């Protein structure tokens, strides 16, 4: 794949759900790679359009660029793009070859794994960590398979002294999260990822979703510690916790897992006791919550809260999150059980 095509496809696929004009595409490529020229981009886009890989939809005097998923060969082209991205990432990082080789071996025989991607790998590897997201096939043993993958990745983490954070998602959860109006980690991952394993399977999944739904990517990366107080208050109310006498205004919709993580990053004991309430009153995704708590180093606090909640109001999500944190050898920080139970009763969460 030639470099202009790679850069164009990489930029378009990082903005699925947010169609770019040719000017915007040129600017994004320039911001990322240092240079880009409208005339060259336009010429290459026309070539890709003639190959039926892209559609250019005229809107006024500009054209929005979209992937043409009706073309059977597009998936192969996108898989080739992912392989090129992987090659470029690893070219000067030979020390990672043995890690990825062993990771491939550990998942090759796992029929549940559809594809594996790395989130923002260039940034994370500089911090001696890697964030992996696993897309799993539909299975009645989803939680069991998640636990086994966590065990395998923990072994690799210990062997290679490389921090690994796992975001393990079923195909149904993937559908829900990619099309959600809430800000969540999967929508972020789509804009800054390399598919390391099973790129064709990944893009076929995206194709199936995109043909029926609007996929919504997010840029840049969300930092939960910087979620505003007003947005926290608004979202706490959405999930069933409202402080008496406190007014709130419409804010951004964050997923409950991000709201929980943002609160855990604060030192406000009053707000932290809101976490069991919203988790008791609202559904959440155990794998996403475990991933975020590990990524932002708040899993010990979270486990202490979940143990109390599990004692008084056990649910599948709570139990499964505890399972995941325990597999990752998390040591809980105990919370005030009496105070939390009182709050749960006050908010009719029991």
Residue ranges and their predicted role:
Residues 1-111, 121-127, 139-350:
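Catalytic core of pol beta-like nucleotidyltransferases
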Residues 133-137:
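Short hydrophobic/aromatic beta-strand micro-patches
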Residues 114-118:
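Glycine-rich beta-strand-to-loop/alpha-helix junction loops that act as flexible
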